[in-house]
Design a protein with these regions (language model features):
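Noncatalytic luminal/extracellular "stalk/propeptide" segments of secretory-pathway proteins
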Residues: 83-210, 214-224, 335, 344, ...
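N-terminal capping segment at the start of a domain
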Residues: 47-90, 106, 110, 125, ...
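Catalytic-core environment of secreted peptidases
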Residues: 64-110, 145-148, 190, 203-205, ...
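Intrinsically disordered, low-complexity terminal tails/loops enriched in metal-binding residues
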Residues: 585-630
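Extracellular/luminal Protease-associated
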Residues: 155-291, 295-298, 361, 391-394, ...
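His/Asp/Glu-rich mid-to-C-terminal helical/loop segments that flank catalytic regions of hydrolases
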Residues: 411, 539-585
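Soluble metallo-hydrolase cores and metallopeptidase-like ectodomains found primarily
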Residues: 53-54, 161-198, 203, 291-395, ...
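Metal-dependent peptidase/peptidase-like ectodomains
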Residues: 157-158, 172, 288-289, 295-316, ...
Length: 630
């Protein structure tokens, strides 16, 4: 559906929300009356059996998790009316209120910390936190020579020119400094090319200076790499994320800022002015967010015209330098003569978003202070009015599936509790916001403001994308789920998952998966035993086509039932999953969690934001029972 049709839906949202509440209320009443267990399954409330000791009891409640109920929830949550649920937007806040209303209807207690005078308000379930845009409200870049301004450029959501535009980095800090030309900004000894080694050999420091680098890598006319890569395919140095170049820059020093020269090439789409206009439009949307100020220096894309003005005092030009490097494959680096770059920025104010937390108190007086946390993120990518056709990213698989699964899990646990089989340990459900912005909701909760003390958090179970299929699984082999853990930290969780799958007759192939960036990372960083369920990166990943109709609801129900059995086992077994003994560990510094950008090998002496990819740094421990990268 196009954006023009979205604005008419506010009244319809409220109507559909009311109908959804009525549907769920009716469904709950019907299934509650049908879920009374036979007498032979009765037991004292504080002695609820585990899945391994009485699998028949667990199966009874598993079967209340149905494809129909999951579909009913997902077709609503991932509809156009929520406008893609982008963090901080109206759609995300409507989704948060929907989730809170569902938890209230199911009988779960609120566990948020939002200030409210009405304990029955949906906000009682909210954990609000502040995020910041990674683009400035306005930026100005000036080129100074002998104290006079020789060129200037202004960029904002309303204004742009053909000289520069803001790309990334610290969107609040002003910066002034000289200029160092660092070639392509590549440091790759395996490929035999290292601009920063060439600077060091000349005794040139980048500290406190603007570093000018060329986009991409040395390219042939057909767009292939001139570097000795396999089959001359492009290397990571040409990635649009700039992750490799940012990592090399941070390892080389502490520059004042970065000037990325974008020139006409086989990889550049449109003119520089076209790209500046697109960046200006993008700045009007929410865009990338952070929990605070970025520690990476401000980075601007600059045109060849502006770059040549900066290099004029040195008697050099971009095309001349690029030609020399491409022909010789040897770095051309130098400190520019008689020129200073000065920038000033105006920052947007903070924006608020919310995690949603709901709580089931444990039934065992000895164990109820211990908590099993079940998580999924409910935000997605929002909408993009510049697209032709469908402009809404509905996020059905990512992570509408995990979100509706948490509601069904909550309902199944509450049914069991009303029948006298409440979990011995407490269970906390958290639906995180801003996962798509860099797992910000879970980082805020686990690293800054855990509303249940982490020492009482015995395990975390995360679901992210559990209803679609990745390209590795053709139609005949789609009865699978990826199980992700981390060595000894997750060993007992994964074993419990395997045992309950067999005992409760769930027909799923368990496949070991890689540790995708998702909300489990920050619980892992706090050394909390965890398990993460996913069906991988689907064909429609981060596309408007990620719609409810693409989901296999029978498969989603099987995965959700498996998660329920695992959570039941952990919540009711006598011993909590064995965790790493913190007293045996040494804090070595802080690293980026495994984000896929390759920046998790750099160790910092401070907490905060990864200057390369923007994720929140986590503690790095060494010692007994923990690997070097935890």
């Amino acid at each position: 559906m196009k954006l023009t049709n979205v604005s008419k839906g506010t009244t319809r949202v409220l109507l559909i929300a009311a109908l959804a509440l009525l549907f769920c209320s009716t469904l709950l009443d019907i299934t509650q009356s049908a879920a009374t267990p036979p007498a032979e399954l009765e037991c004292p409330a504080d002695q609820t059996p585990t899945a391994t000791s009485q699998p028949a009891l667990v199966e009874r409640y598993q079967q209340t998790i149905t494809p129909e109920a999951l579909a009913a929830r997902l077709y609503f949550l991932a509809s156009d009316f929520f406008e893609g649920r982008e963090a901080t937007t109206r759609g995300q806040k409507l989704a948060a209120e929907y989730l809170a209303s569902q938890y209230r209807q199911l009988g779960l207690a609120p566990k948020g910390n939002a200030k409210t005078t009405d304990p029955l308000s949906p906000s009682a379930y909210f954990q609000p936190f502040t995020v910041y845009k990674r683009t400035p409200k306005q930026s100005r870049l000036e080129v100074l020579s002998q104290g006079s301004t020789v060129a200037s450029s202004t960029f904002s959501a309303e204004t742009h020119d053909d000289l520069s535009y803001f790309l990334t980095g610290n969107a609040a800090a002003a910066a002034t400094g000289g200029v160092v030309f660092a070639g392509y900004g590549i440091a790759d000894d395996q490929l035999g090319y290292n601009d920063y080694a060439a600077l060091a050999a000349k005794g040139i420091s980048i500290n406190g200076k603007w570093v000018m680098i060329l986009a991409d890598e040395p390219l042939a006319a057909d767009g292939t790499s001139l570097l000795p890569t396999a089959d001359h395919k492009l290397s990571p140095w040409s990635a649009l994320s700039l992750a490799a170049k940012r990592k090399a820059l941070i390892e080389a020093g502490k520059p004042a800022g970065v000037l990325l020269v974008r020139y006409a090439s086989p990889r550049m789409q449109g003119t520089f002015a076209d790209n500046a206009a697109q960046a200006s439009l993008a700045a009007q949307r929410v865009g990338p967010l952070s929990l605070g100020q970025s520690t990476f220096p401000p980075t601007y894309a600059v045109s060849v015209k502006l770059a040549d003005q900066i290099l004029a005092q040195s008697g050099r030009s971009v095309e001349e330098l690029r030609r020399q490097i491409n022909q010789s494959l040897k770095p051309q680096v130098f400190e520019a003569n008689g020129v200073t770059v000065r920038t000033s920025l105006e920052q947007f104010g903070g924006l608020e978003t919310e995690n949603v937390l709901a709580f089931i108190e444990g039934s065992d007086p000895r164990l109820k202070d211990e908590v099993v946390v079940i998580t999924a993120h409910y935000d997605h990518l929002g909408l993009n009015p510049t697209l032709k056709g469908d402009q809404i990213f509905n996020g059905a698989a990512d992570d509408g599936t995990g979100t509706v699964a948490t509601l069904e899990l909550a309902q199944a646990f509450m049914r069991a509790k009303r029948d006298g089989h409440g979990p011995r340990r407490s269970v906390l459900f958290i639906n995180f916001s801003a996962e798509e912005k860099g797992t910000l909701g879970s980082a805020h909760y686990a690293l800054r403001e855990p509303l249940v003390p982490l020492e009482r958090t015995v395990a975390e179970i995360n679901m992210d994308g559990v209803g679609g299929f990745d390209p590795k699984h053709p139609a005949k082999s789609r009865n699978y789920v990826y199980i992700v853990g981390s060595g000894d930290l997750s060993k007992e969780m994964i074993e419990a998952n395997r045992r309950v799958k067999e005992l409760t007759n769930i027909n799923l192939e368990l496949t070991e998966g890689q540790n995708f960036p998702s909300d489990q990372l920050y619980f892992q960083a706090q050394l909390i035993p965890f398990i993460y369920y996913s069906t991988g990166l689907i064909e429609h990943y981060h596309q408007p086509s990620d719609e409810p109709a693409t989901i296999d609801y029978e498969h989603l129900a099987r995965v959700t039932r498996l998660v329920f059995a695992t959570a039941w086992q952990v919540a009711n077994q006598d011993a909590r999953p064995r965790a790493v003994d913190r007293s045996q560990l040494k804090l070595d510094g802080y690293v980026c969690p495994p984000c896929g950008a390759g920046c998790d090998t750099v160790v910092y002496d401070h907490a905060g934001e990864c200057p390369v990819c923007g994720m929140i740094l986590v503690p790095k421990y060494s010692g007994a029972g923990v690997s070097a990268r935890r």
